[in-house]
């Protein structure tokens, strides 16, 4: 039974958290298995039929069904969960109600509380044209949208004007920009506000001084008898003019565009405010004579009157005054219409009143131009009373003139007022928008507001998914050198099970590349820089070499095998192909049942075995050269385990000979598939597969597909054996695996899938990496029949090979006790045992010999069956010339569906 996920973590999580992108076949299967689909928009779930979405195939939801790859799905939606058939869109959930209703009913309505611009953006996102809006909502939608677009256009123009102030092409750009902001943008800083207040005070002071200079009590008489300005007030005015001049020059020097500065209306007002003063000084100082002064005096008076224009400088600091000026400029059509109406009325009524009043004595309507004044003040409803008609006909004309004046003025005036109010509000909105934009820019620069795309967030989460936090104060000699914060899926015991269930076969090679070395003082931390997702082939090769070059450690006593952490395991999957050879009778040991055993890594073996191999991998490839692999058995067989430790070789001899002469014990081997599984647990060693040699092999084929040792590799070892006839293996009742079905026919080779697991011991239970050859593993060579004179045992590397059965750490002690109780049955339990049938002597290959002295004798797990006996049993018939042998390894309660997560799938080895 597989380990279950922690209760805090939901197994039905998003695709992006526990598995790699699924294959197209899984996506298509998920869509075809259900007629309905779940649409999650902003956290609000909607359920709709697929055929409803097919009504609008060119929209975003219509394209959802045609997306069969991971990339195309992420282009349409933001996330998805194939297990729940759910697709997530990070959009406004309220607007989606109207959009989904459009799919169902064909009627598109806009909600009353929805912003028109936001609803338009939602329509653009979902791929629906706004022309489908119903007539009841169309007018309101377009009116609001046009209004919002106009406001946004004006705001964009203002921002473009402000952002168009380029200072890069001039000298001292930074200083000039600061000075420009200081003088032109009062809201940019506190200093700018203070400077604006000082400027306003100078404007008010200059206006007051100009008014006081006209008082007779404060005036003085010059040498020509003409009144002149008070000297004290003249000094005040000079200071104000000096301030205005300095301000104007600084603006001009710091302006990014000089010509645009001259054309600005406010700058023209500033120039007119200071220019009359200098013209007056120039005229008075250059013309000292009386005659010249009399000629210049009137010109000087004109320029003195122009000083009053200084009051208009307040418009620079007043939004209302600016709005008035812009309103007059924008309302020139209405103002022209008003003037035209007044001119027509004045002409008509002044003519009528002239002909009505010209015959009266002492009349003031002496001519039509003289009557214009009366018509003007009458139509404007002012009525000074200095001129008025006296006759009856003149009074009637005057009454009609008043009514016409009210009607003529009343028509264009509201338009002008409306323009003023709208422009005033727009100015206020633009000021707030500018402040908001500037605040957002400052916040983004400070990092308080971060905008991130969903795909970028997913990529960053994948990069940061493996994190190791170093414990403070721990040394390298401590038991745990790094504290894993359990963010990495490789650290979860159930994570690989979820991976193998939720992804396709093609992605298996990338799932089991996680390395954790705990038998040395160094630990490979899964950091973001060296996470399995980013390890290159060279780095993986280096890691594997470091693992294989680790120095051997001393054995520990069996009672000291307390495993707080389960050691890392290396799972090697070897597919061996047997060639037909002479028929021999083999003795198979009795099967034993092991119950109450949890195996979390069996799913790894199953998914590795269940991978669909290509035709190239199914058949052995011809070698590039005659390279023969010889696996030699030792001739001496020690009797005891201690004697074996003293005399046995640390590992088996693996030689490679060239030429066709090496035909004895030749093994034909094909692509290796070694899966390095990062998991910890107690292990047992079993040697699987028939160790039969062939003395008459012609030309063994050998091909080796070199790949990264940490990546998934498959080894096909073809034993060539001349057999006259052999019965086929009976079909298994369990679901067979694609690569483990065996065929003992005469013409077809036998594929044997054997799982060898290499485990690294825990920190406190160091096992020999360069293990001695087990005693009972060597017993086979000594007790072989003369029919097997040249059989040789083989080993694949310098490290121990163990049959893979991962046991939960919580049940290690019980399992060891169970194995200790069965120590006396070692001679009767073997995974793949060979003996001579006529002598009735069994030479078992027990697991104790391969497992070393650190654990009690263990049963051959590759031959075991559980209490259900669901798989076909081993059949042995002494009366037959040949016999059938079946080797099965499976777990109880097999679930064939990937969604069933309670138990691990079956692992089967048939021979």
Swiss-Prot record:
| Catalytic reactions on record | K(+)(in) = K(+)(out)
Q: Where is the composition biased (Polar residues)?
A: 523-534, 692-711
Q: List the transmembrane segments.
A: 191-212, 233-254, 266-284, 297-317, 333-354, 396-424
Sequence ranges of Basic and acidic residues compositional bias: 508-522, 837-846, 874-887
Q: Which InterPro entries does UniProt cross-reference here? A: BTB/POZ_dom, Ion_trans_dom, K_chnl_volt-dep_Kv, K_chnl_volt-dep_Kv2, K_chnl_volt-dep_Kv2.2, SKP1/BTB/POZ_sf, T1-type_BTB, VG_K_chnl
The record places the motif (FFAT) at 605-611
- Intervals, Cytoplasmic compartment: 1-190, 255-265, 318-332, 425-911
Q: Which stretches of this protein does UniProt put in the Extracellular compartment?
A: 213-232, 285-296, 355-368, 389-395
Identify the GO cellular component terms for this protein: dendrite; neuronal cell body membrane; perikaryon; plasma membrane; voltage-gated potassium channel complex
Q: Which stretches does the entry tag as region Disordered?
A: 1-21, 503-534, 685-740, 821-911
Q: What's known about how it's activated or inhibited? A: Inhibited by quinine at micromolar levels. Modestly sensitive to millimolar levels of tetraethylammonium (TEA) and 4-aminopyridine (4-AP).
Glycosylation (residues): 287
**Locations listed in the record:** Cell membrane; Perikaryon; Cell projection, Dendrite
Q: Which UniProt keywords apply?
A: Cell membrane, Cell projection, Glycoprotein, Ion channel, Ion transport, Membrane, Phosphoprotein, Potassium, Potassium channel, Potassium transport, Transmembrane, Transmembrane helix, Transport, Voltage-gated channel
Tell me the superkingdom of the source.
Eukaryota
The modified positions for Phosphoserine read 448, 608
* MF (Gene Ontology): delayed rectifier potassium channel activity; protein heterodimerization activity
Keyword Lipid metabolism assigned to the entry: answer is no
Task: Provide residue ranges for segments that penetrate the membrane without crossing to the other side.
Answer: 369-380, 381-388
For this chain, the Swiss-Prot or TrEMBL PTM comment says:
Phosphorylated. Phosphorylation at Ser-608 of the FFAT motif activates interaction with MOSPD2, VAPA and VAPB.
**Primary subcellular site in the record, as a coarse category:** membrane
Q: What is known of its domains?
A: The transmembrane segment S4 functions as a voltage-sensor and is characterized by a series of positively charged amino acids at every third position. Channel opening and closing is effected by a conformation change that affects the position and orientation of the voltage-sensor paddle formed by S3 and S4 within the membrane. A transmembrane electric field that is positive inside would push the positively charged S4 segment outwards, thereby opening the pore, while a field that is negative inside would pull the S4 segment inwards and close the pore.
Q: How does it assemble?
A: Homotetramer or heterotetramer with KCNB1. Heterotetramer with KCNS1 and KCNS2. Interacts (via phosphorylated FFAT motif) with VAPA and VAPB.
What is the role of the protein in this entry?
Voltage-gated potassium channel that mediates transmembrane potassium transport in excitable membranes, primarily in the brain and smooth muscle cells. Channels open or close in response to the voltage difference across the membrane, letting potassium ions pass in accordance with their electrochemical gradient. Homotetrameric channels mediate a delayed-rectifier voltage-dependent outward potassium current that display rapid activation and slow inactivation in response to membrane depolarization.
What name does UniProt use for this protein? Potassium voltage-gated channel subfamily B member 2
């Amino acid at each position: 039974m597989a380990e279950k996920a922690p209760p805090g973590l939901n197994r039905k999580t998003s695709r992006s958290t526990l598995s790699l992108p699924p294959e197209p076949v899984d996506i298509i299967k998920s869509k075809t298995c259900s007629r309905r689909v779940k649409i999650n928009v902003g956290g609000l779930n909607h359920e709709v039929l697929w055929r409803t979405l097919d009504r609008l195939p060119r929209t975003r939801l219509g394209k959802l069904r045609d997306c069969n790859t991971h990339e195309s799905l992420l282009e349409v939606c933001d996330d998805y969960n194939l297990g729940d058939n759910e697709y997530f869109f990070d959009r406004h959930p309220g607007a989606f109600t109207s959009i989904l209703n459009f799919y169902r009913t064909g009627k598109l309505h806009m909600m009353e509380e929805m912003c028109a611009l936001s609803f338009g953006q939602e329509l653009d996102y979902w791929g629906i044209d706004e022309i489908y809006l119903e007539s009841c909502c169309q007018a309101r939608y377009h009116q609001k949208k046009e209004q919002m677009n106009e406001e946004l256009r004006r705001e964009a123009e203002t921002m473009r004007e402000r952002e168009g102030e380029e200072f890069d092409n001039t000298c001292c750009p930074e200083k000039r920009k600061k000075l420009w902001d200081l003088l032109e943008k009062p809201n940019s800083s506190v200093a700018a506000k203070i400077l604006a207040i000082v400027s306003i005070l100078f404007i008010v002071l200059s206006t007051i001084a100009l008014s006081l200079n006209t008082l007779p009590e404060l005036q003085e008489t010059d040498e020509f008898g003409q009144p002149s300005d008070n000297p004290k007030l003249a000094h005040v005015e000079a200071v104000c003019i000096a301030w205005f001049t300095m301000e104007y020059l600084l603006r001009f020097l710091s302006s990014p565009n000089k010509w645009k500065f001259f054309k600005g209306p406010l700058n023209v007002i500033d120039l007119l405010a200071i220019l009359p003063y200098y013209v007056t000084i120039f005229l008075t100082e250059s013309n000292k004579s009386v005659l010249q002064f009399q000629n210049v005096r009137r010109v000087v008076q004109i320029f003195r009157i122009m000083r009053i224009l200084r009051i208009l400088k307040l418009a620079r600091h007043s939004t209302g005054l600016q709005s008035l000026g812009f309103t007059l400029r924008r309302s020139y059509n209405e103002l022209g219409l008003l003037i035209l109406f007044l001119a027509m009325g004045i002409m008509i009524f002044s003519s009528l009143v002239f002909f009505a009043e010209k015959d009266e004595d002492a009349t003031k309507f002496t001519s039509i131009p003289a009557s214009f004044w009366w018509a003007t003040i009458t139509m404007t409803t002012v009525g000074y009373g200095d001129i008025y008609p006296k006759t009856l006909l003149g009074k009637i004309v005057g009454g009609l003139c008043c009514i016409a004046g009210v009607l003529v003025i009343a028509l264009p005036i509201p338009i002008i007022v409306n323009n003023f109010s709208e422009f005033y509000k727009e100015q206020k909105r633009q000021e707030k928008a500018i402040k908001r934009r500037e605040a957002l820019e400052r916040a983004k620069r400070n990092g308080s507001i971060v905008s991130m795309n969903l795909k970028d967030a997913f990529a960053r989460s994948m990069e940061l998914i493996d994190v190791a936090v170093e414990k403070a104060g721990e040394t390298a000699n401590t038991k745990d050198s790094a504290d894993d914060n359990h963010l990495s899926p490789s650290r979860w015991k159930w994570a690989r099970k979820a991976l193998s269930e939720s992804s396709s076969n093609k992605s298996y090679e990338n799932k089991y590349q996680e390395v954790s070395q705990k038998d040395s003082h160094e630990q490979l931390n899964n950091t973001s820089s060296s996470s399995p997702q980013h390890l290159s082939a060279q780095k993986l090769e280096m890691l594997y070499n470091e693992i294989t070059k680790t120095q051997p450690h001393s054995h520990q006593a069996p009672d000291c095998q307390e495993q707080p952490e389960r050691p890392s395991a290396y799972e090697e999957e070897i597919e061996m192909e047997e060639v037909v050879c002479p028929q021999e009778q083999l003795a198979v040991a009795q099967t034993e049942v092991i119950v109450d055993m949890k195996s979390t890594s069996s799913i790894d073996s199953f998914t590795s075995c269940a991978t669909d191999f290509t035709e190239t991998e199914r058949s052995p490839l011809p070698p590039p050269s005659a390279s023969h692999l010889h696996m030699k058995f030792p001739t001496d067989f020690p009797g005891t385990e201690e004697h074996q430790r003293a005399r046995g070789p640390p590992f088996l001899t693996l030689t490679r000979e060239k030429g066709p002469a090496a035909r004895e014990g030749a093994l034909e081997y094909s692509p290796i598939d070694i899966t390095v599984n990062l998991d910890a647990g107690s292990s047992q060693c079993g040697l699987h597969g028939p160790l039969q040699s062939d003395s008459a092999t012609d030309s063994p084929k050998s091909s080796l597909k070199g790949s990264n040792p940490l990546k998934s590799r498959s080894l096909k070892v073809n034993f060539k054996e001349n057999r006259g006839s052999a019965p086929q293996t009976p079909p298994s009742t369990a679901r067979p695996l694609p690569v483990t079905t065996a065929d003992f026919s005469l013409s077809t080779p036998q594929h044997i899938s054997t799982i060898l697991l290499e485990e690294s011991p825990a920190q406190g239970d160091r096992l020999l990496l360069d293990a001695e050859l087990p005693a009972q593993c060597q017993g086979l060579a000594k007790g072989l029949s003369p029919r097997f004179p040249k059989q040789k045992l083989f080993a694949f590397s310098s490290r121990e090979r163990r049959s893979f059965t991962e046991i939960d750490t919580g049940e290690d002690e019980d399992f060891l006790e169970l194995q200790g109780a069965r120590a006396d049955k070692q001679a009767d339990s073997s995974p793949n045992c060979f003996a001579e049938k006529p002598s009735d002597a069994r030479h078992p290959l027990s697991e104790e010999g391969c497992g070393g002295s650190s654990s009690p004798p263990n049963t051959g797990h590759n031959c075991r069956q559980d209490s259900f006996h669901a798989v076909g049993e081993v059949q042995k018939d002494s009366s037959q010339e040949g016999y059938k042998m079946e080797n099965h390894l499976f777990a109880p309660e097999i679930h064939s569906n990937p969604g069933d997560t309670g138990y691990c799938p079956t692992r089967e080895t048939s021979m």
